[in-house]
């Protein structure tokens, strides 16, 4: 296990930075993969949108693919996180193991080495002591032997007792000298051949020294020969009971005899070496015991040879106590702990480091003890372990670590010392605790600390990883979210695109049936045999249909604008008139809402501008209808003023200061303008500013920008309360932008919303468009009696500006007062001075008016000022009637003013009646009428009054503007719808401008007027037909194309046949051809062209005027067709090419044959293309009969058409 | 006899209505019928025949064009289908027209598979229509032969 981890660590250690790098690489890879999943998708995003649309299905797959990728990448983050954690765990684990291992191993190894040395040392020293003890003993023995030999040689062959005694005495002296010098000796014995024994002995117990000798009397001098050596034995010593032993105490220092020799029993004798111990004449070693000593003794024995060196004459024995070795061991162990003991080869204990006994007392006296029998438990068990482990074949050196004895661990080392003839085994037993105890403890602690630390680090690391990768995973989440969002957005875009595409493609399909429905309804309405109920229902249906058509048109417009296919018309139109009509229309709605509609156009507005009138009207219609929706009380003002593009720069600085919120737009405008100025310097561009100001609920400033988004409403709940799709403002903004302008909601004081927009329109070159009539010279005095304060104020301001004295009155009382003051001046000259309820400015005004000489009073009375709820109004009228000779009354009627009131007014001779609201143009009409009337004189006036009751005035009461076509027979709402309807319809025809708003009473008197009016009715009818070309073509129009020659170029046989039949049914003469080439050929322009110059040549002499007319007539006559219906897509030569060819051929001639395109496409872009190549109108397939008829008629009989209308 | 006529007339009405309801025909066909009067008694049949001839021609044209694997002339197919769309819308063959629109889209996106599929559908559709109209005309004829009047069918 440890080995494994070690090898692993060895492998990993140098690798570890590499490993982390690898990890990084892995992470990087994973990230790369993620980004890979994202990037192709991203690149897709930039791919062209068209491709997207075309490959909808494919993309959907891609979406799923991307989302699945996203999911898997999300998982991969999880996996990466896990992997990093595992890596961290492994790393920390390795680190821990390594740290632990190294700290432990190195310490352990060094300690082990140290311990080994220590143990060795420990053992070595007692052994060396042993050795030295042995050596000493041996040396002493040898010395004793040598000395003995010397003495014996000297007393060679003692013959006498004296000699012998002398010799023994000499021996005793010599021996004593030696004994005394060697303090460590326990005893020296000399055993002579004859049995005499001399011995010195130290008793450590009593610390006294003894001389021991045997009785000499029994020994012969001669002794036995060498041959008797074998007779020597120990018995002769111990067993020789005959011998008497003496023991004499000596002074340990001097060797003086301290007492008399005492007889001692042989049992108390010390060991005396005998001849038996030196059987081979060599030195021998023994371990012996003595009863005086508690430790074993080491005894050496050596023989002493005689001079001839042939026989042993004596045996010298030296005994040393091993006590000192044990002492040394104890000393050593005291320091180091543990146990040391020495045994003989047989296992007998020689010395131990303990105090325990080394001998055992047996009946035969003390005997050596085996180590295994030692009383010391450690030694005993150690010895037992050694014996058990190694048996009898114990190696010379044993080093055993971790030997478990009992519950402790020990080191056991054993050395075998082969001393001369005395092999010794030394054993050291040291508890492991003493050496490794600290290390083990520390290793354990280190391990614990390391493990806990690494666990901590691991957890911290995990937390860190989590925190660190949290960002990544968050990013992944966000990215996934983003992908989802983008996915959704793209879907939305795609669907929106599909929507636009679909709508664009469906435009025709949608509009045609609606037009048909409305047309059919018109037919139905014009039918006489409808019951009232049916009529009401049908009218309702028609309203609904027009509403639906309007909605459709809104959507289609939006899609058209969005798909960039909207083409704006460039045609002259009367801006003021359009707006007036619009306000007229909406005022009807407003009056219902109790809201005042005011049109306030500045005088410098150009009368005629070039642009798309329908779209312009649509803009304001949308804005105003929007305002009406949200305005319950108050007023809606449509303001307009104009800035000349060239003079704008000077004004800019001023206007920027004046209108802070408008400032950014202005700067934009400047850029725009600069651009414009560069591009078309000479074009007469005007910047027209408009404001639609209402007092409605207003728009929250935060939504000022978003209200212009499609399907966006300022407050979602408005859909519930007010309805609407939220498309209106979007269309408005798109249209305004298309016209080079901008629209914005502007901060306004007080309630409501103020929308400000500007448009850049070009004005026709005709100069002096707005000739303002000069009224100031007529001395007119206008009294405005209207209860709508805003309109009154604006009108009076305008009147004053033009030098017309104006008095305002807001209710009946005020009116009567002023009338009295002004008109009854004759009777009560200065009566107004006495009036106290007239305010000061009014008084000043009145006094000014009085000073005007011969004033003409015009009293404009709002019908609402009269009390119509009761019958008081009649009296009020009568009252006013009194002044009718002094002043001219003009009445402002509401659309719902009852007929009785009208009749009454008429009966009274008040013929100047206009519908509300009052605006500039109407005011001018009134004033002009008054002035004209004044010229005619008073008598006419009277006559006029007399004929007032004539019913023929009926038709006069409503101003026959061009809008009366809408408002004459329909209710208010229908008129509004029709207005929009009309404005949306691409009208190639322009409405003839009917200038009179007000039919003057004087003209109406003439018979011719009534005739013209009767004439007018069918005209209007006709006009209406043409205007709403899908509508009403009744039976009498069936043959409406009588006599018209039509060339039909159509390649599809079916269509050709159908169209032919259709046209022929309506009386037209049709020639069908199959392609463009045939069409061109059949026109035969070439011949005409060739003809024309020749004619020209012929008539060269003639007058030029004549010539031209001739040619023209000839050309007109020579043209075989009145009109061409041209299919756009045809083989050989398509419609466009054919038209171009025809138009080319027409160059240089006065001829222009109308060409109507037939196409299956229904977009304005196609229309634009058609018109571009020179076609005059455009019809879509399948052919709508009525539309076709009206188009053909408008093109073929333009003169008749116009003359009939512009009467 | 009268009962037979009435039965025939009812069948005619039902059949016509079913044709409208199933989307084979639309209002254009009604328009077409309105154009038919004493001066051109077989106008509808004539136009329809023209239409079917045209159809056959155009479809075979397209089939030929689409047959040339590799370099399909989508432009040719496009113009053919455009024509077909025009004529079918003029006749009031609603389904054929709808398919034409789809086919045109396929053609514009150069979707070969889609074109082929659509063309097959157009083929089927036009044949079905042909059969249906044949039945219708047969019914008409039967009514006329029985001495009855073709009833006006209001859709």
Swiss-Prot record, chain A:
Residues 103-446 are extracellular. The keyword Membrane applies. The modification Phosphohistidine is found at residue 508. Autophosphorylated predominantly on His residues. Activation probably requires a transfer of a phosphate group between a His in the transmitter domain and an Asp of the receiver domain. It is a multi-pass membrane protein. The chain crosses the membrane at residues 82-102, 447-467. Its EC number is 2.7.13.3. Pfam families: HATPase_c (PF02518), HisKA (PF00512), Response_reg (PF00072). This is Histidine kinase 1. The lineage of its organism: Eukaryota, Viridiplantae, Streptophyta, Embryophyta, Tracheophyta.
UniProtKB/Swiss-Prot annotation, chain B:
Two-component system major event consists of a His-to-Asp phosphorelay between a sensor histidine kinase (HK) and a response regulator (RR). In plants, the His-to-Asp phosphorelay involves an additional intermediate named Histidine-containing phosphotransfer protein (HPt). This multistep phosphorelay consists of a His-Asp-His-Asp sequential transfer of a phosphate group between first a His and an Asp of the HK protein, followed by the transfer to a conserved His of the HPt protein and finally the transfer to an Asp in the receiver domain of the RR protein. Induction: By salt, cold and drought stress. One of its GO terms (molecular function) is histidine phosphotransfer kinase activity. One of its GO terms (biological process) is embryo sac egg cell differentiation. InterPro entries: AHP1-5/YPD1, HPT_dom_sf, Sig_transdc_His_kin_Hpt_dom. Its main location: cytoplasm. Disulfide bonds: none annotated. The modification Phosphohistidine is found at residue 82. The keyword Chloroplast does not apply. Functions as a two-component phosphorelay mediators between cytokinin sensor histidine kinases and response regulator (B-type ARRs). Plays an important role in propagating cytokinin signal transduction through the multistep His-to-Asp phosphorelay. PANTHER family: HISTIDINE-CONTAINING PHOSPHOTRANSFER PROTEIN 3, PHOSPHORELAY INTERMEDIATE PROTEIN YPD1. This is Histidine-containing phosphotransfer protein 3. It comes from Arabidopsis thaliana (Mouse-ear cress).
């Amino acid at each position: 296990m440890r080995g494994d981890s070690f090898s692993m660590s060895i492998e990993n250690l140098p690798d570890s930075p590499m490993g982390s790098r690898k990890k990084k690489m892995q992470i990087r890879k994973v990230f790369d993969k993620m980004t890979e999943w994202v990037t192709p998708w991203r690149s897709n995003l930039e791919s062209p949108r068209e491709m997207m649309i075309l490959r909808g299905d494919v993309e959907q797959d891609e979406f799923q693919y991307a989302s699945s990728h996203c999911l898997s990448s999300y998982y991969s983050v999880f996996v990466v996180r896990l992997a990093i954690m595992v890596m961290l765990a492994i790393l920390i684990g390795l680190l821990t193991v390594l740290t632990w291992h190294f700290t432990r191993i190195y310490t352990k190894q060094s300690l082990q080495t140290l311990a080994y040395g220590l143990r060795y040392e420990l053992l070595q020293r007692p052994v060396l002591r042993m050795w030295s003890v042995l050596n000493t003993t041996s040396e002493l023995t040898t010395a004793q032997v040598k000395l003995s030999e010397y003495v014996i040689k000297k007393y060679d062959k003692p013959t006498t007792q004296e000699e012998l005694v002398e010799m023994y005495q000499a021996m005793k002296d010599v021996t004593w000298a030696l004994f005394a010098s060697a303090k460590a000796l326990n005893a020296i014995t000399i055993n002579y051949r004859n049995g005499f024994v001399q011995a010195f002995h130290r008793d450590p117990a009593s610390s006294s020294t003894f001389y021991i000798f045997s009785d000499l009397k029994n020994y012969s001098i001669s002794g036995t020969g060498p041959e008797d050596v074998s007779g020597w034995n120990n018995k002769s010593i111990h067993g020789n009971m005959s011998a008497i032993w003496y023991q004499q105490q000596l002074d340990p220092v001097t060797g003086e005899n301290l007492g008399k020799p005492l007889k001692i029993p042989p049992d108390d004798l010390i060991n005396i070496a005998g001849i038996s111990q030196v059987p081979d004449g060599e030195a021998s070693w023994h371990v012996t015991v003595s009863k005086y000593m508690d430790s074993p003794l080491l005894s050496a024995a050596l023989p002493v040879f005689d001079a001839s060196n042939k026989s042993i004459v004596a045996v010298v024995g030296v005994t040393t106590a091993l006590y000192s070795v044990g002492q040394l061991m104890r000393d050593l162990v005291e320091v180091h702990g543990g146990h040391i003991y020495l045994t003989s080869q047989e296992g007998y204990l020689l010395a131990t480091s303990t105090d325990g006994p080394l001998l055992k007392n047996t009946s035969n006296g003390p005997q050596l003890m085996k180590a295994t029998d030692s009383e010391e438990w450690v030694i005993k068990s150690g010895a037992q372990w050694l014996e058990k482990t190694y048996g009898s074949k114990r190696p010379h050196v044993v080093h055993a670590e971790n030997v478990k004895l009992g519950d402790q661990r020990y080191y056991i080392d054993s050395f075998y010392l082969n001393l001369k003839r005395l092999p010794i085994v030394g054993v050291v037993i040291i508890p492991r605790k003493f050496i490794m105890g600290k290390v083990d403890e520390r290793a354990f602690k280190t391990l614990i600390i390391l493990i806990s630390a690494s666990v901590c680090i691991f957890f911290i690391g995990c937390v860190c990883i989590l925190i660190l990768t949290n960002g990544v995973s968050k990013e992944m989440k966000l990215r996934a979210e983003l992908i989802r969002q983008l996915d959704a957005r793209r879907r939305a875009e795609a669907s929106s695109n599909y929507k636009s595409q679909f709508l664009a493609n469906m435009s025709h399909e949608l509009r045609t049936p609606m037009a048909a429905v409305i047309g059919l309804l018109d037919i139905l309405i014009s039918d006489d045999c409808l019951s009232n109920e049916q009529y009401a229902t049908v009218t309702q249906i028609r309203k609904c249909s027009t509403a639906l058509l309007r909605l459709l048109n809104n959507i289609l417009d939006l899609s058209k604008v969005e798909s960039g296919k909207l083409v704006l018309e460039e045609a002259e139109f009367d801006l003021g008139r359009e707006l007036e009509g619009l306000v007229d229309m909406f005022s009807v709605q407003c009056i219902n809402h109790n809201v005042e509609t005011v049109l306030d156009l500045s005088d410098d507005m150009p009368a005629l501008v070039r642009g798309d009138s329908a779209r312009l009207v649509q803009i304001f219609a949308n804005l105003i209808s929007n305002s009406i929706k949200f305005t319950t009380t108050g007023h809606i003002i449509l303001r307009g003023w104009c800035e000349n593009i060239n003079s704008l720069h000077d004004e800019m600085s001023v206007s920027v200061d004046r209108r802070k919120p408008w400032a950014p737009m202005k700067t934009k405008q400047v850029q725009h303008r600069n651009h414009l100025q560069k591009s078309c310097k000479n074009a007469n561009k005007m910047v027209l500013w408009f404001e639609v100001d209402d007092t409605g609920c207003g728009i929250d400033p935060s939504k000022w920008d978003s209200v212009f988004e499609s399907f966006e409403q300022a407050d979602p709940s408005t859909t519930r309360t007010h309805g609407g799709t939220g498309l209106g403002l979007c269309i408005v903004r798109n249209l305004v932008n298309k016209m080079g302008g901008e629209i914005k909601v502007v901060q306004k004081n007080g309630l409501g919303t103020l929308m400000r927009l500007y448009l850049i329109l070009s004005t026709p070159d005709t100069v002096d468009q707005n000739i303002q009539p000069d009224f100031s010279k007529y001395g007119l005095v206008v009294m405005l009696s209207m209860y709508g304060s805003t309109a009154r104020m604006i009108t009076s301001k305008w009147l004053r500006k033009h030098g017309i004295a104006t008095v305002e009155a807001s209710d009946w009382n005020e009116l009567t007062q002023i009338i009295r003051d002004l008109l009854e001046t004759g009777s009560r000259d200065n009566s107004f001075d006495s009036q106290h309820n007239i305010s000061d400015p009014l008084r000043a005004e009145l006094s000014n008016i009085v000073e005007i000489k011969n004033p003409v009073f015009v009293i404009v009375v709002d019908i609402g000022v009269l009390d119509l709820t009761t019958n008081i109004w009649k009296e009020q009228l009568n009252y006013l009637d009194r002044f009718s000779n002094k002043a001219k009354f003009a009445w402002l009627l509401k659309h719902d003013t009852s007929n009785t009131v009208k009749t009454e007014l008429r009966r009274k001779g008040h013929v100047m009646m206009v519908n509300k609201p009052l605006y500039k143009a109407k005011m001018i009409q009134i004033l002009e009428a008054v002035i004209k009337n004044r010229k005619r004189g008073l008598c006419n006036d009277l006559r006029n009054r007399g004929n007032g009751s004539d019913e023929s005035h009926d038709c006069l009461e409503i101003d026959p503007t061009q809008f009366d076509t809408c408002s004459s027979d329909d209710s208010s709402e229908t008129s509004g719808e029709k207005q929009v309807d009309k404005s949306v319809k691409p009208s190639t025809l322009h409405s003839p401008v009917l200038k009179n708003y007000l039919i003057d009473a004087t003209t109406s008197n003439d018979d011719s007027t009534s005739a013209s009016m009767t004439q007018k009715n069918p005209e209007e009818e006709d006009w209406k037909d043409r205007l709403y070309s899908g509508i009403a073509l009744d039976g009498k129009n069936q043959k409406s194309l009588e006599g018209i020659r039509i060339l039909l170029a159509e390649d599809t046989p079916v269509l050709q046949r159908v169209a032919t039949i259709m046209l022929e049914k309506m009386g037209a003469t049709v020639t069908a051809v199959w392609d463009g080439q045939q069409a061109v050929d059949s026109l035969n322009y070439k011949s005409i062209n060739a003809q024309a110059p020749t004619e020209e040549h012929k008539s060269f002499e003639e007058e030029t005027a004549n010539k031209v007319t001739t040619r023209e007539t000839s050309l007109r006559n020579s043209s075989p067709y009145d009109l061409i219906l041209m299919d756009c897509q045809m083989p050989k030569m398509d419609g466009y090419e054919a038209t171009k060819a025809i138009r080319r051929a027409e160059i240089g001639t006065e001829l222009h044959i109308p060409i109507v395109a037939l196409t299956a496409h229904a977009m304005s872009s196609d229309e634009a293309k058609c018109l571009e190549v020179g076609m005059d109108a455009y019809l879509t397939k399948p052919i709508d009969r009525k539309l076709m008829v009206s188009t053909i008629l408008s093109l073929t009989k333009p003169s008749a058409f116009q003359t009939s209308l512009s009467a | 006899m009268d009962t037979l006529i009435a039965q025939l007339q009812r069948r005619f009405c039902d059949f016509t209505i079913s044709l409208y309801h199933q989307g084979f025909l639309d209002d254009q066909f009604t328009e077409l019928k309105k154009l038919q009067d004493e001066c051109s008694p077989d106008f509808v049949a004539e136009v329809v025949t023209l239409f079917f001839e045209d159809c056959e021609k155009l479809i075979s044209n397209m089939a030929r064009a689409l047959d040339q694997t590799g370099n399909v002339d989508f432009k040719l197919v496009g113009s053919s289908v455009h024509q077909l769309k025009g004529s079918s819308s003029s006749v009031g063959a609603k389904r054929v027209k709808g398919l034409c629109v789809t086919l045109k889209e396929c053609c514009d996106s150069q979707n070969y598979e889609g074109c082929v599929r659509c063309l097959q559908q157009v083929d089927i559709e036009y044949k079905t229509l042909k059969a249906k109209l044949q039945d219708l005309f047969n019914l008409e004829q039967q009514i006329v032969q029985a001495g009855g009047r073709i009833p006006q069918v209001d859709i």
